[in-house]
Amino acid sequence: YLPQHASLDSKFPVTATDVVLMGRLGTTSNIGFYNKEDHKAARHMLERVGLEKLQDRPLSALSGGQRQRVLIARALVSEPKLLLLDEPTSSLDDYVERELYDLLQELNKELTIIVVSHDIGFVSRYVQKVVCVNREVYIHPVGEIDENVIHGMYGEHVHMVRHDQEHNHG
């Protein structure tokens, strides 16, 4: 699970590897101590998310996108079958957001990923199905999200903007 806002004290002296290792707590009988397999798994997950060169960097020295990747590595290091992400890009710029969704798309080849997001237009380029919840549940293949679906979910005063097409702001 990756929460929308992880409560991490930026002054706490912990490295990227330390954070990923925390995901191994409870997966072995070595309570409080990490073995060689734990360290190997943490290194592997940092490689998977493209942060192997930053493994010894303090968490406080990482960008928002790098921190999100560390937290994803922490969630993955316990080898889950399901990854649940709550607004994983809420504080990221567009470029880092795309990078993160590209990573999730790659990871989705191996495990089920559920993403909670309010940005249906952007997210729909990366997912297989969209489930909208607003007093009712709407399940749609990605290609079927149109203005009728959006109006049914959010009311008449919402405009749909497609991120993959040019649009006027006027």
Task: Say what each PLM segment does.
Residues L21, K36-L54:
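Conserved ABC ATPase "signature" region
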Residues Q128-G143:
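H-loop (His-switch) and adjacent beta-strand-loop-beta switch element
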Residues I145-G170:
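ABC ATPase nucleotide-binding domains
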